[in-house]
Amino acid sequence: SVQWLTTGKGDMKSGSVTTLHDEDTVPEGFIEIPEYRVEFGCGDRCNPSFEEVSESKPAIYRLQWFRDHGLNPAHCKRLKVSGDSMIPILFDGDSVLCDCSSKEIISGKIYAFCFGGSQRIKRLFTKLNGGLIVHSENPNEQDEEIAPDEMDQFILIGRVVDRSGSGPF
């Protein structure tokens, strides 16, 4: 408990930790968010579609967490991180929760997107000329720029609103 951690008094293990087993149902006030793979069907304009990853276990979130963050869980998808370009924030194998209803870029936030045929998760900065700076957190990676006349190749999947995984903080 917080009291035990701060004062050494009280019950060490009091709290609201809930352990679920595979056969358990999700408790009231919680929701499962499965992991998805993003697929792109290209015509005149590529639009992402989401395929649920059946071999992955869903993450369980409190519904209150979504309310506290102003998010609708129906618009959120979990995606798997691949690569080391976002270390030390995101690590290979981590999962991120993306708000796929978010279609306006807030400069300095992390987004999942497709550009030039590749799917990425990066920090985006808006430019006054209408382009973007694509920033990797890994200091070994250089920033990229997307020029205003290249924005027709840019497809926003969603804003990253949470991460989970085994990478250190």
Set out the residue ranges of the language-model regions.
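Short, positionally conserved secondary-structure boundary motifs
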Residues: W4-D92, F154, V161-F169
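Acidic/glycine-rich C-terminal interaction modules and beta/coil loop segments
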Residues: F66-F169
